[in-house]
């Protein structure tokens, strides 16, 4: 049986995708500001979206200058159906267990930025 997910704010797919793009831009701004203030001599990191994935957008954090030589890790996941934001359980999957699995929505008033931290999606709600 396939489960249907609905956005609690009544957003449609096009709006979710647009808000997701804004969310990624906001995360990158937050990370860039952190690196500029705390580590101005280091290569900055940024968050990119993995091109594959039927159910989730995977956000990957990597070095901006040389992504192929630097370390990469999963920043978090966003479900395409409803814009729900999840922390990463592993490289391949989000943490979806329990009532507190969803950390926020990209359609929230904050555009999901309340769930975003410099190093990844907020761990505890």
Predicted regions and their residues:
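Short, acidic, Ser/Thr-enriched surface-loop or helix-capping motifs
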Residues: 78-80
